Curated annotation (Swiss-Prot):
Belongs to the TCTP family. It comes from the Eukaryota. The gene is TCTP. Keywords: Calcium, Cytoplasm. Involved in calcium binding and microtubule stabilization. The keyword Cell cycle does not apply. This is Translationally-controlled tumor protein homolog. Residues 1-167 form the TCTP domain. PANTHER family: TRANSLATIONALLY CONTROLLED TUMOR PROTEIN-RELATED, TRANSLATIONALLY-CONTROLLED TUMOR PROTEIN. It comes from Pseudotsuga menziesii (Douglas-fir). It is found in: Cytoplasm. The keyword Cytoplasm applies. GO terms for cellular component: cytoplasm. Gene3D superfamilies: Metal Binding Protein, Guanine Nucleotide Exchange Factor, Chain A (2.170.150.10).
Length: 167
């Protein structure tokens, strides 16, 4: 199994269990999330309920709907950004990330990241923002939105901000 960690914070953000599609010459990865139902069962094996006057069966099921990617990697949702805040984050993130890339990759990244950033700005009001479990200030941001008519979210990752780790 391959896990993709945030290059800047080390948080696990994705794995090869979730196929991705490259956008903007590989600058962004698009990953389809799914709503899943998780449940916990509580079984009361205590005293005889009829003797205590209770009619309960002793089994309680609690179901919770979660998004698989958010739950699996313990992503933490962040408050929405306005355009000024978002542009400030993107500039800082690109600057921090570029220092971690090879010179050759830096040039390619800088050439293609502008289109990706413009697309994100155009969807800003539709985006949900997530960070890794550590909530590191300078770490990667994971973006989620719903495509037209979709019931499951689509996630966007900066590919160069991910480090491949084999487990």
């Amino acid at each position: 199994m391959i896990v993709y960690q945030d290059l800047l914070s080390g948080d696990e953000l994705l794995s090869d269990s979730f196929p991705y599609k490259e956008l903007y010459n590989g600058v962004l990865w698009e990953v389809e999330g799914k709503w899943v139902v998780q449940g916990a069962v509580d079984v009361d094996i205590g005293a005889n309920p009829s003797a205590e006057g209770g009619d309960e069966e002793g089994v309680k099921i609690r179901l919770v709907k979660v998004v698989d990617i958010v739950d699996t990697f313990r992503l933490q949702e962040q408050p929405p950004f306005d355009k000024k805040q978002f542009l400030g984050f993107i500039k800082r993130y690109i600057k921090n990330l570029a220092t971690k890339l090879s010179e050759e990759r830096q040039a390619e990244f800088k050439k293609n990241v502008e289109g990706a950033a413009k697309m994100l700005v155009s969807k800003l009001s539709d985006l949900q923002f997530f960070v890794g479990e550590s909530m590191h200030d300078d770490g990667s941001m994971v973006f989620a939105y719903y495509k037209d008519g979709a019931t499951d979210p689509t996630f966007l990752y900066f590919a160069d901000g991910l480090k491949e780790v084999k487990c």
